[in-house]
Amino acid sequence: RLYGKAGAPDLFLKHGRDTVASDLLDEMVRLRWMANHIEVPAVTHFVSTTDEAWLLMTALAGETAYQALEARPDERKTIVDALADFLRTLHAIPISECPFTSDHSYRLRLARKRIDAGLVEEDDFDEEREGWTAEQVWQEMHRHLPFMADQVVTHGDFSLDNLLMVDGVVIGCIDVGRVGIADRYQDLAILWNCLGEFDEALQDRFLARYGVPKPDPSKLRFHLMLDELF
């Protein structure tokens, strides 16, 4: 994070090589597209070479949703309501206007490549899958296929750390490199899982507020396992 002088915005600089450089390119083009639909950091500069990339962008104001939930336990219900409302706004963006694909078929192909290349961090799996190999996750995940996709514009990594809040309202999101058309459970599953750290009742409240009081458990499990591979 680069702190601006008085009256100037703070900035964030991301740098990476090889696959990370490719990820930064993905994030840059999505930031520019998302800026027409929802609050995201503004790209100020992007530079790339054959194997490196630098992305400079403005910093959003506020605190992360995780910080808000930690700091104000008595406000957790209203915070969760705000998260659900923001996700509904995101998912209401017309898919006809989105040029990016992030559906499960596409991400399965990427996940297979990551497994074969040994890039999956198996020691970072959720407690439910502690001790599993990436191949075990892959095999178990396929037990939940096929399913009928309910496509919307998704964030792709809709976690508490990627949502910024000011005065109880979600004002924007960050880390948008996975934005694209996919099943809505791509986002629902990740945030639902994050809220489990705080309270199962908050998980239920989030889904009900969003509009799925009776979620599809198979879709939840599939998308959580898919996320383990990234």
Residue ranges: model-predicted function:
Residues 76-81, 89-156, 215-216:
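An alpha-helical support segment within catalytic cores of ATP-dependent transferases
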Residues 46, 89, 140, 194, ...:
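A generic secondary-structure signal
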Residues 1-7, 12, 99, 136-186:
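Active-site acidic catalytic loop and adjacent metal/ATP-binding pocket
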Residues 221-230:
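Short, amphipathic C-terminal "tail helix"
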Residues 25-28, 81-85, 135, 139, ...:
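Generic alpha-helical structural signal
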Residues 3-5, 31-35, 115, 125-128, ...:
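Alpha-helix C-terminal capping segments
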Residues 1-100:
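ATP-binding pocket architecture of kinase catalytic cores
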Residues 20-21, 147-153, 166-221:
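Active-site Asp-x-Gly
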